[in-house]
Amino acid sequence: MCASRLVLLLGLLLCVGAHLSSGQHWSHGWYPGGKRELDSFGTSEISEEIKLCEAGECSYLRPQRRNILRNILLDALARELQKRK
């Protein structure tokens, strides 16, 4: 009888402890994980960037083949120079 009461009490404490430990204080304007509301940032700036990207003027979305090829060649030359030393 005493063991069953102890198990019941431990189960109840486990449930209450699990419920209380999952609580989180959120500051004003913050969501879980430290994320802020998007309205607090300059949404006009974000929408302007999106409009530019939709028009096809995003240079960071286009592959820079010349730069990639140049970087590969420079890395290969640097490795060859290190091997010779």
Swiss-Prot record:
Post-translational modification Pyrrolidone carboxylic acid, affected residues: 24
Annotated keywords: Amidation, Cleavage on pair of basic residues, Hormone, Pyrrolidone carboxylic acid, Secreted, Signal
Main location: secreted
Superkingdom of this protein's organism: Eukaryota
An annotated Gene Ontology molecular function: gonadotropin hormone-releasing hormone activity
One Pfam family hit: GnRH
Modified residues (Glycine amide): 33
Tissue localization of expression: Midbrain tegmentum.
GO cellular component, one term: extracellular space
Signal peptide: 1-23
Subcellular location: Secreted
Function: Stimulates the secretion of gonadotropins.
Family affiliation: Belongs to the GnRH family.
Name of the protein this chain belongs to: Progonadoliberin-2
UniProt source species: Verasper moseri
